[in-house]
Amino acid sequence: MTAPTIQPGELGIEVVADSAGRTRTASLRQRYPQRVTMPLHCDPDRPGAVTLCVQSPSGGTFSDDELRTTVACRAGSHLHLTTQSATQVFAGDGAGARHHLDFTVDRGAALEYYPGTVIPHTDSTFTQTIEVNVETGGLYLGWEAVAAGRLAHGERYGYHTYDSAILARVDGRAVARDRQVIRPGTDAMSLLEGDYLATLLVVAPGADIEALLRRLRATLDDGSGVSGGAGRLPAHAGVFLRLIAQRAPDLHRARTDLFAAARRELLPGKDES
C-alpha cells in the first residue's frame, strides 16, 4: 500500500519507548520547509528522553506558508521538541503564515515543547492553532512567545495580526481553550507593557496540580524583568501561565526557570528524586 503524499510544510513525528526505556523515533514524515535533526539523547538527568530540533532552511515563514506539525508520544516516551532559532514571520501578498500543531501524549509519556520566539515583521500576519490531547498520566509542557517585532531594526508592533489559539483535551474531553489576538494600533494594545508576551501551558492530569501551581508562582515571583500570573485549569488538569517581559534575556531566563520548576515537580530526575 502506497503511503500518502507528504504535503509541503508537513512534519509528522511519532516516538516510542524501547525495552530499555529510551525514547526512539518510530516514524517521521517531513517536507520543506520543516525538517528535524537526528534524535539526540542529551539530557543527563533523564537519559531516556530524546531531543528533536525543528529546522527551517527558508529562514522563516512566508505569507503563503501553511505548516502542519503532528506529534504523537506513545506510552513511556519522553520528547523534547524545540526549534533552531526564533521564527521570523515575513510580510507578503498572501493571506498570512499559518501553522497548525496537533500533539498527542499517551499515558506515561511526556512532551516538552519550547520553540523559539515568534518575531513578526512589519505588516505580517501569523495564525497558529495548537491542539493538545493528553491521556491521564501523561504530561505536556508547552511554551509560546511572541516579540513586538524586529526590535533591533526599530520595528515595534508594526505587524498586522498575531493570532494564536490553544485547545487542550484530557482523555478526549476539552478542558481548556485560549486565544490571543494581537492587532497593533487598537486600544487593547495599552494592556501590553512589554516587548515580549509568553504563555506556559502544563497539562498533567492525575498530578498534584496545587503543588505545581505553588512552585510555578514562586518561580515567577522570584524572577526579574518579568510580570505575570498563573492559575489552574478546570478539573485540576494542569496550569496556565502568562507573562510579559521587556528584554529577551529576561524572557529566556523565565522560560528556563519555569520549565525547571515544572520538571522538578512532575519529572524528578536522578538528581531530584
UniProtKB/Swiss-Prot annotation:
CC terms in the record's Gene Ontology section: cytoplasm
Compartments reported by the entry: Cytoplasm
Function: Required for maturation of urease via the functional incorporation of the urease nickel metallocenter.
Entry's family note: Belongs to the UreD family.
Chief site of localization: cytoplasm
GO molecular function, one term: nickel cation binding
Top-level division of the source organism's lineage: Bacteria
Organism expressing this protein natively: Mycolicibacterium gilvum (strain PYR-GCK)
Any matching Pfam family: UreD
Record's keyword terms, sorted: Chaperone, Cytoplasm, Nickel insertion
Quaternary structure and interacting proteins, as annotated: UreD, UreF and UreG form a complex that acts as a GTP-hydrolysis-dependent molecular chaperone, activating the urease apoprotein by helping to assemble the nickel containing metallocenter of UreC. The UreE protein probably delivers the nickel.
Protein name, as recorded: Urease accessory protein UreD
